[in-house]
A protein has these predicted regions:
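Polar/acidic, low-complexity leader/linker segments enriched in S/T/G and N/D
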Residues: 1-39
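Short beta-strand and beta-hairpin "edge-sheet" elements
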Residues: 29-31, 87-130
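"Short basic amphipathic alpha-helical interaction patches in structured regions
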Residues: 74-81, 112-114, 135-137
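Mixed-charge, glycine-accented linear interaction segment located at domain edges/termini
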Residues: 8-10, 123-125, 210
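Intrinsically disordered, low-complexity segments enriched in serine, threonine, and glycine
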Residues: 130-237
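Solvent-exposed loop and beta-edge segments used for protein-protein assembly and interaction
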Residues: 55-57, 80, 112-116, 150-152, ...
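Oligomerization/assembly interface segments of phage tail-like spikes and tubes
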Residues: 39-69, 114-128, 216
């Protein structure tokens, strides 16, 4: 017998395709802010110093699983390794970037029964990425307000269509673009500017744009015909 929440996906492959079924899903977990606690002589409590804005420690999310056929263990161990993306049946709307972070012991459930149970620990890097993101948002007029529905800043990929020298302004932060021919991509995820396979970092001056939760004012000067944005909305939990 199987249940609706008996799976997870690792690098796009569902666990049930490998004969792995989930007995217990990891709970939805809020990550912890990365901070330093300092005791202050003569005062109660401690002083908290944040180590950056919107910086959070990794989460360890554990899926407790079982398999019916131990002969598939070599196949499973070849699949469950390294890094990639993980999503869970109790939260199929998105994914984490993660690594498998534990040795996986396969233990027999009952003597004489071939079923084996095991736990997989995924060390997840917050935030949680929504898969229901709009693929693209097209903006054709300056002074446009783009609303980030997430709970943490996003790292967008912005395709700027235009020619010559221009300035992109996101929430008051300026990105100067010089000598552009037709278009340029500003990829805030990988911190690179390019067109196709050609790097164009030398044509950009300024910080790669981020989109904060809530309203984001986007405007420009110069010959920009449109922006096409992959927003990459994200959530803390």
């Amino acid at each position: 017998m199987t249940f609706l929440n008996d799976w997870f996906e690792w690098n796009g492959e569902r666990s049930t395709a490998h004969g792995v079924y989930v007995l217990e899903q990891p709970p939805v977990t809020m990550p912890q802010e990365r901070s330093k606690q300092t005791s202050v002589p003569g005062k109660p409590g401690s002083l908290t110093t944040l180590k950056g804005e919107d910086v959070y420690d990794d989460l360890t999310l554990t899926a407790t699983c079982f398999i019916r056929d131990p002969a598939r263990i070599p196949e499973i161990t070849a699949w469950l390794k390294g890094g990639g993306t993980v999503s869970f049946a109790n939260r199929p709307c998105g994914f984490y970037h993660a690594r498998v972070s534990n040795q996986i012991p396969f233990e027999k459930i009952l003597r004489g029964n071939p079923h084996c149970s095991f736990a997989v620990n995924f060390r997840c890097s917050p935030p949680f990425w929504y898969v229901s993101n709009p693929e693209e948002v097209t903006i054709t007029t300056s002074s446009y307000v783009l609303v980030n529905p997430g709970s943490v800043y996003s790292e967008p990929i912005i395709h700027v269509y235009g020619t010559g020298d221009m300035t992109l302004i996101v929430n008051g932060s300026f990105v100067e673009l010089e000598g552009i021919e037709d278009s340029i991509v500003l990829n805030s995820v990988i911190q690179e500017a390019y067109q196709g396979e050609m790097l164009l970092n030398e044509k950009m001056d300024g910080e790669f744009p981020l989109l904060k939760p809530g309203n984001n004012l986007i405007s420009w000067t110069g010959d920009i015909s449109r922006l096409v944005i992959a927003p990459n909305w994200r959530y803390l939990a």
